[in-house]
């Protein structure tokens, strides 16, 4: 599987927990493993506006989008468009987008489902990629935090089903129960690989896979043991998650969400992708 990456995503936010090192070190590990890399272009404004409100996009361009988690970095709109472009390219080539900033907490107008911050997110990368493809899609969110932005964007969309496995109670405080086409599976902290994998089997059993042409994975690694939303997952756990996703035999792509140890991210991504061809 090809990895989508640009060093431009390392240019900002070195002081922040959602900083470049979490991606830089992962890139180094995956390069050593022999993965092929592709450079993304910017998502077009048309691509962005399929998902996000025009006034929100204007404020993001003007540097007016900021909260306690999510700084108004200089040129952040361009960095966010590049991450969204990475997701689009990954969707096209059935690859993995190793880009930042992440996206699954960003709703149509930024804040989503009553949450007061955007959780390091500016544009919803996976939503932009799914809308770009325009095909029936299962979005599988394995980040340790609930993808409140993704749920808000696709709630009621008959062509998309969102499935989220996440720690609860935990930020953003949403995702306790399912609603319509958004199926949520809250898990206790540090539940471990075995409980997680059983829950993933349960989640997939509730989905009519024949409805979907695409599986889009919000690939967060902060569920790794000791990370911000630890569910006690290990490298072996991510390997088994990858096997389950590969067994679905769909057009599959991955978009990086959280995960704040670059070392763990690189190893977990490699394990996740081992069931897919290099």
Which residue stretches match the model-derived regions?
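Metal-dependent catalytic neighborhoods of phosphoester/phosphodiester hydrolases
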Residues: 227-229, 262-267
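Metal-dependent C-N hydrolase catalytic cores
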Residues: 1-130, 134, 186, 204, ...
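Short acidic/histidine-rich active-site segments
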Residues: 251-258
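Conserved alpha-helical scaffold segments that buttress catalytic/binding sites
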Residues: 88, 99-249, 273-275
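A short, acidic, flexible beta-alpha connecting loop/helix-capping segment that sits on the rim
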Residues: 9, 223, 258-262
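Short, electropositive alpha-helical surface patch
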Residues: 54, 234-235, 264-278
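Short, hydrophobic-biased amphipathic alpha-helical segments
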Residues: 22, 83, 241, 265-273
